[in-house]
């Protein structure tokens, strides 16, 4: 796993009985006009499926009537009425935004003057409330015509596609022909005052002007409309979680994300997640794939955020995670390897010698290790490697990873090597 993905995953709040409704993310989507009702639904529902607690859609009244029939899980506010005074709309939007961690502006917004004015009001309110912003689709049309509205707001993520990026470059007087392709997004971010840019393309480039990350994982060959809306919901979710993370709620992970880089890693995680979801859906549906199919694969694609913690230590997948994957992701066909200490006594000696444990944490870790070693003997793992010599254990693990493991190297069927 890349360091960037570890940092993105660190934003994910642990589910805990101590959290109450809304603390795992409250997201809003501004969009949904007379012509477009699917886009805001996909964005908000993607956020719900990925893991936010609450998702609101702020939309035009007729669009709201339709969106309300899609899913009872979404909270729909039909307040962007072209016949209402802009002051009334501003107050209605502010009432909703005041409850949110993040606002996504653009899915299904449209470009008529009224909806563009509503986008401007929403962006202004989000900035005043100091919450995360994701700007996509026709929200970028507004930004392109009102650059100062977003310049310098470092809690924002822009998600331009090829054409939207071209417009931004023209607006900012950037000549792409005079630059390396990989430097264009960084220059856009720099001229926007450090706003995070997620440039969508064959390779997604994510940058805040000083740091640049890339995602080139395979996605879908079918470019059906709506995948960008899934991405905006994913980015909004991780940015909402970043807000929770910055407040120290629901996360005790050792991996620390600099607060100024939260939008960067939120965008990186969203890109990785969406590409994986798109790939899985295309493998299943092929040419007939539509965006609605992706919603069904969001949970499976979300396996990248599986993690476990113990005594405030962070692990990718432990025995608990193996159980989750076996139960919920049977089609992945992974190879499960358990790295075992030679014995509980030897583990205890190692931990005592390390001097990093209190009596209470030592007892807890040994109890947990005993349970996991017993679980390893139930047939749950393809290989059990005893870590009594780090170099030998590494060599055995390397052979497993390369498919070179044999019974003489590593005894399968859960017999300890």
Question: Residue ranges of each PLM-predicted region?
Answer:
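Short glycine-/polar-rich loops that comprise or flank the Walker A/P-loop
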Residues: 53, 330-335, 379-381
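Conserved AAA+ ATPase "sensor/coupling" helix adjacent to the nucleotide-binding pocket
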Residues: 171-172, 302-305, 350-357, 400-403
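Conserved phosphate-donor/acceptor-positioning beta-strand/loop module used by diverse small-molecule
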Residues: 323, 331-354
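ATP-dependent small-molecule kinase phosphotransfer cores
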Residues: 292-321
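Small-molecule kinase domains that catalyze NTP-dependent phosphoryl transfer to phosphate-bearing small molecules
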Residues: 356-403, 412-417
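A short, charged, Gly/Pro-tolerant segment at domain boundaries
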Residues: 271-275, 407-417
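Small-residue (G/A/S/T)-rich helix-start motifs and N-terminal tracts that mark the onset
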Residues: 1-134, 141-157, 162, 166-297, ...
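Switch/connector loops and helix/strand junctions flanking conserved nucleotide-binding motifs
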Residues: 167, 324-326, 344-350, 392-396
């Amino acid at each position: 796993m890349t360091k960037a993905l570890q940092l993105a995953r660190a934003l994910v709040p642990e589910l805990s009985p101590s959290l109450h409704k809304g603390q795992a993310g409250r997201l809003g989507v501004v969009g949904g006009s007379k012509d477009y009702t699917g886009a805001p639904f996909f964005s908000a529902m993607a956020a719900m499926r990925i893991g936010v607690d609450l998702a609101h859609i702020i939309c035009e009244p007729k669009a709201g009537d339709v969106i309300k029939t899609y899913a009872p899980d979404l909270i729909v506010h039909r307040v962007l009425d072209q016949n209402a005074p802009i002051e009334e709309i501003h107050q209605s939007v502010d009432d909703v935004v005041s409850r949110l961690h993040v606002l996504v502006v653009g899915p299904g917004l449209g470009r008529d003057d009224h909806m563009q004015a509503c986008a401007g009001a929403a962006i202004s309110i989000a900035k005043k409330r100091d919450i995360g912003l994701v700007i996509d689709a026709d929200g970028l049309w507004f930004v392109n015509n009102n650059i100062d509205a977003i310049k310098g707001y470092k809690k924002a993520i822009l998600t331009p596609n090829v054409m939207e990026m071209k417009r931004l470059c023209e607006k900012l007087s950037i000549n792409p022909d005079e630059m390396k392709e990989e430097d264009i997004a960084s220059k856009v971010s720099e001229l926007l005052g450090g706003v995070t840019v997620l440039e969508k393309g064959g390779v997604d480039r994510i940058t805040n002007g000083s740091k640049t990350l890339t995602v080139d994982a395979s996605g879908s060959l079918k470019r059906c409309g709506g995948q960008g809306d899934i991405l905006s919901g994913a980015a909004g979710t991780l940015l909402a979680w970043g807000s929770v993370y910055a407040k120290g709620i629901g996360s005790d992970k050792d991996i620390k994300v600099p607060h100024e880089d939260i939008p960067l890693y939120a965008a990186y995680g969203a890109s990785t997640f969406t590409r994986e979801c798109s790939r899985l859906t295309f493998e299943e549906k092929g040419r007939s794939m539509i965006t609605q199919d992706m919603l069904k694969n969001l949970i499976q694609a979300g396996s990248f955020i599986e993690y476990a913690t113990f005594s405030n230590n962070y692990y990718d997948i432990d025995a608990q995670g193996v159980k989750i994957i076996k139960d919920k992701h049977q089609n992945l066909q992974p190879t499960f390897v358990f790295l075992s200490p030679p014995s509980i006594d030897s583990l205890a000696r190692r931990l005592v010698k390390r001097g990093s444990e209190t009596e209470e944490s030592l007892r807890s870790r040994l109890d947990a290790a005993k349970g996991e070693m017993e679980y390893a003997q139930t047939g749950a793992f393809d290989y059990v490697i005893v870590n009594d010599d780090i170099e030998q254990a590494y060599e055995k693990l390397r052979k497993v990873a390369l498919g070179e493991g044999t019974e003489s190297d590593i005894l399968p069927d859960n017999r300890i090597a």
